[in-house]
């Protein structure tokens, strides 16, 4: 069986070795754990963001960045594709691990989750778990983890702490903007999973989303990076599942009652309480489904340039 940690480790090793050329900073802790700072105390960059995203997808995704436009405004776009959508997106990329050790907090994603099985239900549904002696984790945080944090991760993954590897970037950083936009396909797969659809029937996924300009404030950065997919993420999924027609109307973000405002404004109105936000908002703007058994194509949703540009600060 494919090992997402083994595949991601190869990318991590390259990032660690060539960190200086990538505006990243490598660290090896006293306990042997290795960390690459991709934006906490350094600038990071587009190539670093690509590598971060590839690691987050467990080495099962292809990532490209190119310039595009939203109306008359030039903006970089990330394009992500995978031929293993269920494993790459839910088994690795999903931010399903809250790392909270002493005073350290981070949202954890990446292939290490497939060792720790966080959350376990996800791996039961996709019928996948990894077996490998290295754990590779992606941490969305303003701070680097210390030895105690890495030991906690190692214990959860049942590996030696010297075999733990972490890439770290704040939301309010270039790599942060890139890797969140790089979750555009994941949001579609995640949404279908939440609706009860068997995501193992999805055979391929591709999508693109604009990379949000970096905000100084972390909460505002969280808003604009999420808006990249909510209001301008375009996804195509290939599958063998004629029953998908029963799910179409519930997939895109414009079906959410919170739709129509920048995420930061919605979050502020909810007194910055996630539990008051309609979770169906966390979906791509538009999705195309190519259903193979009946040879049909479905299209739902639409991009919203107005809200995207407002969120990004262009208008």
Swiss-Prot record:
Principal localisation: cytoplasm
Cysteines engaged in disulfide bonds, as pairs: none
Enzyme Commission code(s) on record: 3.5.4.27
Pfam families in the record: MCH (PF02289)
UniProt KW keywords: Cytoplasm, Hydrolase, Methanogenesis, One-carbon metabolism
Membrane-spanning residues: none
Role played: Catalyzes the reversible interconversion of 5-formyl-H(4)MPT to methenyl-H(4)MPT(+).
NCBIfam families according to UniProt: one_C_mch
Protein name: Methenyltetrahydromethanopterin cyclohydrolase
